[in-house]
């Protein structure tokens, strides 16, 4: 699952 606000 990719999280757009992980950085």
From Swiss-Prot:
Q: Which organism is it from?
A: Litoria rubella (Desert tree frog)
Please provide one cellular component term from the Gene Ontology annotations of this protein.
extracellular region
Alanine amide (modified residue): where?
7
Name the domain of life. Answer: Eukaryota
Distribution of this protein across tissues and organs: Expressed by the skin glands.
**UniProt KW keywords:** Amidation, Amphibian defense peptide, Secreted
Where does the protein end up? Secreted
Q: Does the keyword Repeat apply?
A: no
Q: What is its main location?
A: secreted
Q: What is this protein called?
A: Electrin-5
Q: Does the keyword Cytoplasm apply?
A: no
Gene Ontology process terms (BP): defense response
